[in-house]
């Protein structure tokens, strides 16, 4: 069984929540919950409110996502 394709979105972190979770406003205006990927945790990349990020989301649940990249300015 093949793994489903993930959908990528760009957005901006609007709020930092407890337990390494974030509220992200997407470029199209929707707000979603997101968590940082294992690579970001392993390399200790900090994500703050106002950072631009790239999210991966499942096409089946577009309310949650995984942050896989923090843009530099």
Swiss-Prot record:
Pfam family, one: eIF-1a
Keyword Electron transport assigned: no
Residue span, S1-like domain: 1-72
Keyword Cytoplasm on entry: yes
Family, per entry: Belongs to the IF-1 family.
Cell compartment(s), UniProt: Cytoplasm
Leader sequence residues: none
Gene3D superfamilies xref list: Nucleic acid-binding proteins (2.40.50.140)
Organism: Cupriavidus pinatubonensis (strain JMP 134 / LMG 1197)
Functional summary from the UniProt entry: One of the essential components for the initiation of protein synthesis. Stabilizes the binding of IF-2 and IF-3 on the 30S subunit to which N-formylmethionyl-tRNA(fMet) subsequently binds. Helps modulate mRNA selection, yielding the 30S pre-initiation complex (PIC). Upon addition of the 50S ribosomal subunit IF-1, IF-2 and IF-3 are released leaving the mature 70S translation initiation complex.
Subunit structure comment from the entry: Component of the 30S ribosomal translation pre-initiation complex which assembles on the 30S ribosome in the order IF-2 and IF-3, IF-1 and N-formylmethionyl-tRNA(fMet); mRNA recruitment can occur at any time during PIC assembly.
Originating gene: infA2
InterPro entries linked: NA-bd_OB-fold, RNA-binding_domain_S1_IF1, TIF_IF1
Name of the molecule in the record: Translation initiation factor IF-1 2
């Amino acid at each position: 069984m093949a793994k489903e394709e993930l959908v990528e979105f760009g957005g901006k972190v609007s709020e930092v929540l407890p337990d390494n979770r974030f509220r992200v406003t997407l470029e199209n205006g929707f707000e979603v919950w997101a968590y940082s990927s294992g690579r970001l945790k392993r390399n200790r990349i900090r994500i703050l409110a106002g950072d631009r990020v790239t999210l991966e989301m499942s096409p089946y649940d577009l309310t949650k996502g995984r942050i896989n990249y923090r843009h530099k300015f």
